[in-house]
């Protein structure tokens, strides 16, 4: 038997909202395609997660899409073109466009009088929905409602897929999608465009994680939301303190390991989290991390396309060798591109960089993992201080 990875039992049981008895998590195996053939079951070309349904009751299997909206949708289209996300399909009856790169699907919803456009009126440029891949959407939706989730609006037209959704962070929607891969939702509801193959793609591959910014005192509520409905578990907890402000961050992950959501809460009323909440006019998704197999090439391509990145203090690179032992990266190349590095030779290396705010207060992260499954904890302090310095320059704090 070829076992790819064994993910150990996490050390903390979750807290549900409202309080529920703690659940027991079990270890599970990720097994290579073709290894198992129980009862003649057909294994698809994807890796299969074999586990007791109690471990993954919703059958999560990763992100299917992220849906964006804005008062000016053309600004989103221009941004996605700059990031290498070509428009590959358009909805058959609605003003919705699919932009794709690698296994990342971004939707721009500009349909008049839609939930998305009302969301744009409330928040400006924003993320109004995301789609979770699940084993059985109808069963997952039924379970979510039984556990207290609020259903989202039904907007499917004649001969269109009715994809169930529930309300999530800041009133955004979480769609439950069980058609993906070779037979997807886009085959039914979208028509392909004539987009040509792009040899200059920046090489973004997957949604690595996305973060939530929540109001003070709401972290337990939202971590409990994901624990209770999807059986997420906490895998990291951070307490970051700058010169004048600070934040807490709790990183949650799904049983399948493919949906990771750090939840951020401010320690005070002036931090970058509070600034986001004021500008966004509510809680929501702060940034989306997109993975690359070659972050140097990706950053070079994105910069050449005009995408701006957050700066990093020069002093950051002076301490890299002492902090990230045995990393074998060129400090000159890291510094030239302002790429951050974390980890160690033993724990693996993580490379990351953050764009400036590009959709209201929302920004993107570009990340490359070389055996490190963290979130750049060692960089949090440096990044926090960098953003705080910008806040001080702008007179926010």
Region roles according to the model:
Residues 43, 47-73, 127-130, 187-223, ...:
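N-terminal beta-strand motif that seeds the catalytic metal site of vicinal oxygen chelate
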Residues 62-66, 80, 85, 99, ...:
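Short, structured motif recognition centered on aromatic/hydrophobic residues
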């Amino acid at each position: 038997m070829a076992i790819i990875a064994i993910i150990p039992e996490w050390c903390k049981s979750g807290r549900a909202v409202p309080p529920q008895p703690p659940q027991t998590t079990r270890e599970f195996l990720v097994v290579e395609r073709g290894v198992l053939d129980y009862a003649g079951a057909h294994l698809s070309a994807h890796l299969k997660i074999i586990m007791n349904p109690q471990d993954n009751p919703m059958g999560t299997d990763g992100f299917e899409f992220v849906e964006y909206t804005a008062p000016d949708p053309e600004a989103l289209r221009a941004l996605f073109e700059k990031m290498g996300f070509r428009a590959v399909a358009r909805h058959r009856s609605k003003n919705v466009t699919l932009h794709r790169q690698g296994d990342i699907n971004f939707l721009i919803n500009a349909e008049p009088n839609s939930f998305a456009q009302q969301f744009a009126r409330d928040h400006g440029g924003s993320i109004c929905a995301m789609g979770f891949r699940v084993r059985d959407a109808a069963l997952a939706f039924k379970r979510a409602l039984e556990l207290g989730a609020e259903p989202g609006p039904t907007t499917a037209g004649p001969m269109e897929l009715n994809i169930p959704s529930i309300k999530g962070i800041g009133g955004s929607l979480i769609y439950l999608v069980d058609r993906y891969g070779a037979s997807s939702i886009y085959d039914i509801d979208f028509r392909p465009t004539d987009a040509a193959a792009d040899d200059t793609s920046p090489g973004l591959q997957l949604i690595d994680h996305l973060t939530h910014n929540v109001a003070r005192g709401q972290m337990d509520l939202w971590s409990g939301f994901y624990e209770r409905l999807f059986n997420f578990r906490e895998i990291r907890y951070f307490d970051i303190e700058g010169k004048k402000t600070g934040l807490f961050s709790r990183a949650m992950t799904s049983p399948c390991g493919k949906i990771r959501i750090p939840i951020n809460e401010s320690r005070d009323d002036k931090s970058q989290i509070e600034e986001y909440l004021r500008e966004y006019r509510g809680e929501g998704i702060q940034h989306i991390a997109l993975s690359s197999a070659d972050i140097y090439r990706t950053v070079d391509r994105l910069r050449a396309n005009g995408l701006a990145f957050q700066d990093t203090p020069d002093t950051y690179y002076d301490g890299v060798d002492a902090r990230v032992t045995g990393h074998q990266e060129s400090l000159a190349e890291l510094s030239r591109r302002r790429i951050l590095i974390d980890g160690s030779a033993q724990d693996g290396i993580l490379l990351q960089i953050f764009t400036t705010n590009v959709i209201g207060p929302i920004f993107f992260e570009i990340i490359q993992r070389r055996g490190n499954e963290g979130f750049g904890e060692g960089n949090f302090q440096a990044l926090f201080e960098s953003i705080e310095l910008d806040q001080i320059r702008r007179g926010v704090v």
